[in-house]
């Protein structure tokens, strides 16, 4: 495979044993695809499918008025262009959204005519609110912040059968139940009680016998019994009767009388059990009917009503038990043939018959009234109301919707095939079939459903969630429209008078702004963004709650394989409820997760890839990805490890249907980034996956020496890097932008053949980390579509780089790495390896107050000159100023209310003038504990307020940048066009031209070069055709210029119009500070294997343990952190990292040699490194220059990829170590024979340690838990209102709680004065603490403790219990 522009520069050596059959799919496809389908913005109206907005509109419209004389029909909708782009929305705090306009038609019918005739039709476009748009990276900008809508994993609509696991009844009897869950509408439950009577309930209300529901849908007791039971046929005799003999019904029963054959020979004696031999004898005897005694009939249940043939009178009802009197009545009425229900105790229970007895309703109407009373207790049941309610429950499309998924699940569970054909409401057949399946379950046939099976849980994505909200808004609109439609004809209203878009906007706004599933995007680094968008949550509206979710829901299920990651999930209360999609997983049309498999055709593994959902997968036998194959793709082993229906087994290759696509198929993105994951304990892998998302981007990102090969995919798919949209040549590069002249073949005619990529510079992320893009191409480079042009935060040459590669030694060091502490060399800090930039946004607003407007100004009294020096004339800090806590950033004064003045103040005012004191200083200052550099200032001014100088200069800068972009585009377009014109003109004959060009002369290059290029258009060509082409070229150039001028004007208009600010705000100023955070003790760090720790000390380089050649270790870790935690992956990573670095050193040595032989020797060595083991790299496809550039990039270490579950073996690591450290080098560095340990020396004494130490390189991360954010101290500060105790927490500038255990400690030491001070003046003794403060100021250190306020609170609380408690004061 050919390498891309960036891959060539640094090829990652992979240890994978298998070729990739399928590339990792685009990681944000689920989100983007779902929202695209929801909007269908670029689809022609006629081609739109019934999904998303289209579905919502067509389900609500047409809206018909109450009298049916007017209706509002939906025609189509269109989305407008958003006013501001993503970046502008973020700056201005706006929502990135498009206006939605729907074309609706108002149809009025003629009242005068008997049959419906249309009187008039009015069509109009109506504004329906704003619909937020998704950015290219799958997030939304809502009120200026980036948010993500997390997908929800909920229980799929359909029918489910389960039992209570014997928990309800003390006997431990299994009570079966069924539940029909629609997408929207009432839930219908069926359940058995301990007495085996079957009940139903609607929406978890009071339960009623199920036969009420059956009667309500139009069944009679006879038809109910006929539906659920088989019958026994009897012919009555004067004594006893004859029974039709059905052999299988007698097997295993006790004979209650002698059974004889035709000749009267007794085959089964009384009280004997009937076995198979007896039945064979009876069949051989040709017995069709058996004579039964009278008492055999008693207790049987009639299947049908018994009617007297003469009088028509009902002698006995269906479901009546046969007694002596009933038999006599039937004989008296000359009834000969009767049918009874066939039941037994084993697998034909009489449940429906018993239920029918418990049901007291007589007919269909009575049954429906009973249901009405249950649903609407206390309301009088009129016939219309009863009918309407019953229809609305399950049969009306407005109130009940199974959805396609629900219909498909119902059909497949009730055994009607897997398609979604059928009505979207419930049918009588559905209800009957469900009850039938439930009764069969109770009879011991069939299986209950597993709720946690991924075939019974589906994913609702952004599009679907947004559609539901939009529909909810439309329903509110529908009610209002129905009211007004009646007036439409009388008042001559237009559609826009009827529709109010507020409810829609409100519903959408509420969903995107404050829904549980709309989350503030985790933007610490590219991985956290991508993981957040691939997250699947079981919480949220219509989902589970943390408190109610049991162990089963959270547990890993066999169907998670390849669909949901078994590793990555949060620790804590949400464990197992929030999951991450697996690497290759995708959603099918019904919203079920699918995973890809390779199909096996005739015993051969093909490259055909099929996606299977959890339900489909259960029908196949699937081999693992690491099964050994021969060259033809046949299995080598006689027995292959496979999975079938969740069970693992060994089977013959002939039985296998599919094979996994890749070993990393089962894990998520974050877990697939952990090298040697297969050697880590799952708990630690979970922590590793979670902590990578918290890694802070370093100042200089460094690729991991040991990766897994997924790094490039993550970096590119996350959108942090800049990718070329079209191939071409780099025309211009600077730190801010990359300009590319597009290849002719990729350019569309009439478009500008220039792509300009403006890079994001020092921008704040949601977590205050720094997003900054750096170009990695040079002028003149040829790039192809999709190549990486610029690195973003945490990426290095287009690969994810979350941390730094550190030289790590595993050894104890003076207790400084006790309990996971980390000892770090000062060199790491000096080299800024873990320095990160954090950007803080500070905002100040100038409001219009009752006493007058606040003013942004430099003119502030009582401010030192040093403070004012940083402010410009407008009172705003300069960019580049270095500021620390309490420095003024923006000067602001607020008018102060008039106060009563003392005579002295009046005198002073009279002498020194009025002005100074009627305003107070409310400037924006740097918060405590923060120092940094001002990197950007933005000023927003309300429409109609005069801009200050600073705001104007910001706008001018922005316009200058934009003009430069346009000029670049124009320059390239013009050069391009003039090159083509020159080619056409040279050698052509002319009729004349500038500089007295003679008629008939031929044009030369020299002549054209002398002219100004715009004068070329004045040349009169002899050939008419060419003259036309020349004229067209001139027109097209002038048109382009005009287009660019228009674009500039548009931009200028946008920038100079006033900003939309909250009511009452005149100006808003945002100041951005860049804060440099160096590594310091107290910062949390971690590797990728869950090996986390806190920096305990930063030690001078000279004190660190060092190697024989003087190389000091960067980090010293405690070896005891490895064995008990079972994350051995970190040790293997260290070994492989050591090899990677060593190979880099060898390459560097070669490059130091003479230039000539370099390429050849380097090429030979690289072949050895890349192609001895693992998958091969195509070094031979590179030119000598490319090989040398590659070698130069590899000097600091060759990056290795050891894919998850398919990584480097111990043997391969050993081979690499030998390549990296030949014997002479190993001896010089005093490495052990295996090269995996080295003899180290104590930096302080120079002595050798007593045993060799494991040393090597590990990719180590600095996490977002920085001590700077947590460090906090309080002198005096705010107090709680009721208890008057100091508040807690850094945000409230609170104190540290002196809790009861601390009090015990002081009591134990007898430190009574300290204790008194803690509980009174330092806490809630109001008078005491003011007194102490005064005393300290005077230099008098005495405390005078009084009554703590919380004691008064206690007294008040006791009084509230009506106990009058008072203190005796002496």
Swiss-Prot record:
InterPro entries: DNA-dir_RNA_pol_bsu_ext_1_sf (IPR042107), DNA-dir_RNA_pol_bsu_external_1 (IPR019462), DNA-dir_RNA_pol_su2 (IPR015712), DNA-dir_RNAP_su2_dom (IPR007120), DNA-dir_RNAP_su2_hyb_sf (IPR037033), RNA_pol_bsu_bac (IPR010243), RNA_pol_bsu_CS (IPR007121), RNA_pol_bsu_protrusion (IPR007644). Gene3D superfamilies: 2.40.50.100, 2.40.50.150, 3.90.1100.10, 6.10.140.1670, DNA-directed RNA polymerase, beta subunit, external 1 domain, DNA-directed RNA polymerase, subunit 2, domain 6, RNA polymerase alpha subunit dimerisation domain, RNA polymerase Rpb2, domain 2. It comes from Bordetella bronchiseptica (strain ATCC BAA-588 / NCTC 13252 / RB50) (Alcaligenes bronchisepticus). One of its GO terms (biological process) is DNA-templated transcription. It holds the Pfam family RNA_pol_Rpb2_3. Its EC number is 2.7.7.6. This is DNA-directed RNA polymerase subunit beta. The keyword Nucleotidyltransferase applies. One of its GO terms (cellular component) is DNA-directed RNA polymerase complex. Keywords: DNA-directed RNA polymerase, Nucleotidyltransferase, Transcription, Transferase. The keyword Transferase applies. DNA-dependent RNA polymerase catalyzes the transcription of DNA into RNA using the four ribonucleoside triphosphates as substrates. Belongs to the RNA polymerase beta chain family. One of its GO terms (molecular function) is ribonucleoside binding. It is an enzyme of class 2 (transferase). It catalyses: RNA(n) + a ribonucleoside 5'-triphosphate = RNA(n+1) + diphosphate. The gene is rpoB.
């Amino acid at each position: 495979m050919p390498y891309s522009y960036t891959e060539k520069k640094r090829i990652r050596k992979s240890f994978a044993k298998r070729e990739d059959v399928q590339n990792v799919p685009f990681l944000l496809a689920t989100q983007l695809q779902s929202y695209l389908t929801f909007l269908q913005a670029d689809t022609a109206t006629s081609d739109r499918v019934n999904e998303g907005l289209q579905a919502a509109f067509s389900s609500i419209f047409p809206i018909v008025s109450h009298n049916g004389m007017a209706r509002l029909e939906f025609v189509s909708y269109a989305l407008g262009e958003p006013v501001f782009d993503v970046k502008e929305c973020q700056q201005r705090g706006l929502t990135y959204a498009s206006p939605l306009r729907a074309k609706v038609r108002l149809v009025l019918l003629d009242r005068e005519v008997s049959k419906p005739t249309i009187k008039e039709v009015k069509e109009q476009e109506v504004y329906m609110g704003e619909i937020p748009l998704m950015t290219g990276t799958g997030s939304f900008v809502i009120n200026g912040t980036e948010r993500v809508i997390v997908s929800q994993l909920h229980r799929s609509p359909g029918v489910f059968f389960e039992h209570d696991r014997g928990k309800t009844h003390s006997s431990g009897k299994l009570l079966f139940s069924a539940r029909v869950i629609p997408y929207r509408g009432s839930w219908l439950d069926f359940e058995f009680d301990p007495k085996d009577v079957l009940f139903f309930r609607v929406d978890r209300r009071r339960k009623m016998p199920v036969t009420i529901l059956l009667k309500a849908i139009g069944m009679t007791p006879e038809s109910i019994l006929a539906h659920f039971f088989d019958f026994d046929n009897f012919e009555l005799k004067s004594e006893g009767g004859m029974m039709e003999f059905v052999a299988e019904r007698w097997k295993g029963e006790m004979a209650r009388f002698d059974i004889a054959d035709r000749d009267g020979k007794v085959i089964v004696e009384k009280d004997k059990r009937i076995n198979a031999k007896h039945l064979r004898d009876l069949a051989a005897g040709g017995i069709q009917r058996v004579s039964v005694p009278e008492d055999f009939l008693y207790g049987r249940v009639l299947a049908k009503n018994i009617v007297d043939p003469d009088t028509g009178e009902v002698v006995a009802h269906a479901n009546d038990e046969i007694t002596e009197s009933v038999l006599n009545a039937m004989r008296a009425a000359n009834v000969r043939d009767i049918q009874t229900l066939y039941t037994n105790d084993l697998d034909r229970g009489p449940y429906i018959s018993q239920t029918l007895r418990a049901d007291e309703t007589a007919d269909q109407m009575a049954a429906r009234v009973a249901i009405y009373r249950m649903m609407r207790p206390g309301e009088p049941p009129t016939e219309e109301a009863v009918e309407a309610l019953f229809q609305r429950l399950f049969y009306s499309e407005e109130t009940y919707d199974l959805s396609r998924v629900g219909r498909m699940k119902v059909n497949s569970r009730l055994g009607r095939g897997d398609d979604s054909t059928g009505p979207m409401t419930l049918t009588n057949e559905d209800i009957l079939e469900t009850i039938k399946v439930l009764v069969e379950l109770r009879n011991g046939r069939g299986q209950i459903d597993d709720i946690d099976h991924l075939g019974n849980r589906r994913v609702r994505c952004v599009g679907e969630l947004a559609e539901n909200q939009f529909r909810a808004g439309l329903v509110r609109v529908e009610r209002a429209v129905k009211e007004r439609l009646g007036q439409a004809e009388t008042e001559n209203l237009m559609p826009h008078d009827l529709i109010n878009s507020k409810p829609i906007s409100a519903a959408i706004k509420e969903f995107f702004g404050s829904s549980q599933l709309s989350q503030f995007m985790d933007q610490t680094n590219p991985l956290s963004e991508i993981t957040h968008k691939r997250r699947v949550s079981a919480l949220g509206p219509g989902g589970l709650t943390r408190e109610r979710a049991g162990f089963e829901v959270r547990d890993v299920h066999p169907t998670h394989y390849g669909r949901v990651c078994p590793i990555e999930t949060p620790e804590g209360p949400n464990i197992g409820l929030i999951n991450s999609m697996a690497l290759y997983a995708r959603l099918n049309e019904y919203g079920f997760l699918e995973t890809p498999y390779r199909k096996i055709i005739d015993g051969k593994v093909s490259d055909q890839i099929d996606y299977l959902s959890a339900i489909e997968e259960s029908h196949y036998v699937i081999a693992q990805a690491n099964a050994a194959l021969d060259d033809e793709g046949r299995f080598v082993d006689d027995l292959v490890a496979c999975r079938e229906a969740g069970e693992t087994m060994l089977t013959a290759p002939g039985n296998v249907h599919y094979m996994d696509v890749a070993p990393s198929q089962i894990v998520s993105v974050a877990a697939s980034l952990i090298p040697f994951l297969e050697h880590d304990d799952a708990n630690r892998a979970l922590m590793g996956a979670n902590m990578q998302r918290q890694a802070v981007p370093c100042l200089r990102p460094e690729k991991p020496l040991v990766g897994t090969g997924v790094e490039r995919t993550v970096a590119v798919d996350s959108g942090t890097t800049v990718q070329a949209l079209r191939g071409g040549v780099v025309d211009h590069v600077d730190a801010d932008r990359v300009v590319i002249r597009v290849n002719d073949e990729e350019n569309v005619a009439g478009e500008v053949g220039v792509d300009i990529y403006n890079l994001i510079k020092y921008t704040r992320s949601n977590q205050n980390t720094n997003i900054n893009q750096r170009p990695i191409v040079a002028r003149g480079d040829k790039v192809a579509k999709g190549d990486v042009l610029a690195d973003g935060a945490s990426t290095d040459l287009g690969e994810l780089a979350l941390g730094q590669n550190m030289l790590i030694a595993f050894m104890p060091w003076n207790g400084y790495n006790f309990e996971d502490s980390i000892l770090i060399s000062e060199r790491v800090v000096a080299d800024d390896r873990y320095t990160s930039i954090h950007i803080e946004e500070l905002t100040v607003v100038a409001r219009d107050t009752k006493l007058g407007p606040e003013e942004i100004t430099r003119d502030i009294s009582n401010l030192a000159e040093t403070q004012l020096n940083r402010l410009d004339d407008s009172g705003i800090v300069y960019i580049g100023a270095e500021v620390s806590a309490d420095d003024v950033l923006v000067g602001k004064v607020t008018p102060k209310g008039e106060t009563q003045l003392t005579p002295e103040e009046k005198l002073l005012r009279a002498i020194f003038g009025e002005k100074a004191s009627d305003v107070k200083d409310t400037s924006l200052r740097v918060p405590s504990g923060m120092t940094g550099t001002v990197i950007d200032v933005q000023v927003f001014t309300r429409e109609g307020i005069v801009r200050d100088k600073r705001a104007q200069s910001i706008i001018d800068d922005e316009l200058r940048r934009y003009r430069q972009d346009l000029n670049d585009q124009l320059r390239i377009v013009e050069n391009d066009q003039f090159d083509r014109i020159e080619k056409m003109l040279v050698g052509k004959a002319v009729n004349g031209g500038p500089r007295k060009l003679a008629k008939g002369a031929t044009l030369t290059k020299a002549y054209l070069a002398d002219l100004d290029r715009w004068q070329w258009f004045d040349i009169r060509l002899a050939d008419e055709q060419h003259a036309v082409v020349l004229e067209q070229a001139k027109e097209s150039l002038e048109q382009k210029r005009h287009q660019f001028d228009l674009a500039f004007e548009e931009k200028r208009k946008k920038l100079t119009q006033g900003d939309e600010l909250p009511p009452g705000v005149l100006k808003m100023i945002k100041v951005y500070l860049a804060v440099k955070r160096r590594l310091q003790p107290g910062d949390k760090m971690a590797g990728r294997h869950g090996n986390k720790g806190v920096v305990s000390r930063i030690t001078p380089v000279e004190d660190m343990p060092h190697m024989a050649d003087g190389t000091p270790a960067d980090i010293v870790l405690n070896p005891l952190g490895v064995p008990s935690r079972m994350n051995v992956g970190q040790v293997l990573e260290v070994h492989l990292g050591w090899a990677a670095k060593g190979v880099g050193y060898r390459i560097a040595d070669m490059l130091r040699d003479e230039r000539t032989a370099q390429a050849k020797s380097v090429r030979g060595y690289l072949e050895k490194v890349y192609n001895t083991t693992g998958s091969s790299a195509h070094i031979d496809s590179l030119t000598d220059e490319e090989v040398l550039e590659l070698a130069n990039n590899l000097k600091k270490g060759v990056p290795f990829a050891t894919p998850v579950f398919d990584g480097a073996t111990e043997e391969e690591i050993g081979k690499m170590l030998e390549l990296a450290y030949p014997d002479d080098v190993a001896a010089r560095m005093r490495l052990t024979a295996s090269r995996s340990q080295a003899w180290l020396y104590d930096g302080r004494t120079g002595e050798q340690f007593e045993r060799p130490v494991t040393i090597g390189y590990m990719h180590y991360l600095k996490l977002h838990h920085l001590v700077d954010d947590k460090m906090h101290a309080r002198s005096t500060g705010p107090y709680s209102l009721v208890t008057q105790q100091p508040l807690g927490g850094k945000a409230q500038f609170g104190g540290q709680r002196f809790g009861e255990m601390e009090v015990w400690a002081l009591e134990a030491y007898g430190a009574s004065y300290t204790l008194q001070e803690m509980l009174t003046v330092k806490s809630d003794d109001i008078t005491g603490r003011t007194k102490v403060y005064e005393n300290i100021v005077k230099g008098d250190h005495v405390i005078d403790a009084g009554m703590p306020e919380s004691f008064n609170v206690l007294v008040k609380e006791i009084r509230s219990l009506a106990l009058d408690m008072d203190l005796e004061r002496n």
